[in-house]
Amino acid sequence: RIMKRLTEIPYDRGAAVRYAHTWAYCRNPRYFNYDGIGGDCTNFASQCLYAGTGVMNFTPIYGWYYLDPNDKAPAWTGVPYFRNFLVRTEPSPGPFAREVSLEEVEPGDFIQLRFDKERFTHTPIVVDVGSPAAPDNILVAAHSDDTDFCPLDRYDCRAMRCLHVLGAWKREENQEK
């Protein structure tokens, strides 16, 4: 009998941030560019997150994965679904996070921005944090509009929520005797 269990693995913040710097002003050809159909910011955020975890969740609808433009989870490209997947309470494969205050963010975390009264619509990745952490010294990278090392206070937003990545769950197969 094969037993599958989840093991917690660390989040490689450095790998996520390096990926962000590499691809902030261009597009990785392995992924579709969603600029023309709603924006590429959360697709880029997911790519960065995947670079730091290496684990996807292939659960239809509720998972977090990308195979091609027609086979991906809503959480890979959708701002609210990205957040909902990360802060889920039941362990399942893939990265996980918790919402924190702005003062608690670290490089490799994500900040979602709301520009109107309705909904959050942008997901930049934090690439550097000054001390003490504040909007003028938290630097982010993003697609749609492409930016890197951009101070958070350059965004004229009404609200923000911060997602602190804690690690990822990885499924391991063990032979049971």
Residue ranges and their predicted role:
Residues 66-140:
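...with weaker cross-activation on analogous glycine-rich loops/strands in unrelated enzymes
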Residues 12, 18, 22, 47, ...:
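Mature, Sec-exported extracytoplasmic domains of Gram-positive
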Residues 25, 49-50, 116, 129, ...:
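Residue-level marker of positions within ordered structural domains that often coincide
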Residues 126-177:
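Glycine-rich, aromatic-bearing surface loops/beta-hairpins
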Residues 2-77:
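N-terminal capping segments
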Residues 40-47, 109-112, 122, 140-148:
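Residue-level signal for functionally critical sites in structured catalytic/ligand-binding pockets
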Residues 58-61, 123, 152:
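Short, solvent-exposed loop/turn and secondary-structure capping segments
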